[in-house]
């Protein structure tokens, strides 16, 4: 697992209070991990702070799974 993936997983566990085993790449923040819309906004803000990237609102709306977050952050960091 990449450094970005590990960090994303840690942030999700901390913010949503879910079991680490549930935080798989395919896990949906809302459907699988019980997040609501406010939780997803807070997660995006935490990702921005942790990785030093900006995630515009239109991109944030497309981040629905753990893998979506990892892929987006890795892409932004590579720019």
Curated annotation (Swiss-Prot):
It is found in: Cytoplasm. The keyword Lipid biosynthesis applies. The keyword Disulfide bond does not apply. GO terms for cellular component: cytosol; membrane. Its main location: cytoplasm. Coiled coil: none annotated. Disulfide bonds: none annotated. Residues 2-77 form the Carrier domain. The modification O-(pantetheine 4'-phosphoryl)serine is found at residue 37. SMART domains: PKS_PP. 4'-phosphopantetheine is transferred from CoA to a specific serine of apo-ACP by AcpS. This modification is essential for activity because fatty acids are bound in thioester linkage to the sulfhydryl of the prosthetic group. GO terms for biological process: lipid A biosynthetic process. GO terms for molecular function: acyl binding; acyl carrier activity; phosphopantetheine binding. Pathway: Lipid metabolism; fatty acid biosynthesis. Keywords: Cytoplasm, Fatty acid biosynthesis, Fatty acid metabolism, Lipid biosynthesis, Lipid metabolism, Phosphopantetheine, Phosphoprotein. Belongs to the acyl carrier protein (ACP) family. NCBIfam families: acyl_carrier, PRK00982.1-2, PRK00982.1-3, PRK00982.1-4, PRK00982.1-5. Carrier of the growing fatty acid chain in fatty acid biosynthesis. This is Acyl carrier protein. It comes from Acidiphilium cryptum (strain JF-5).
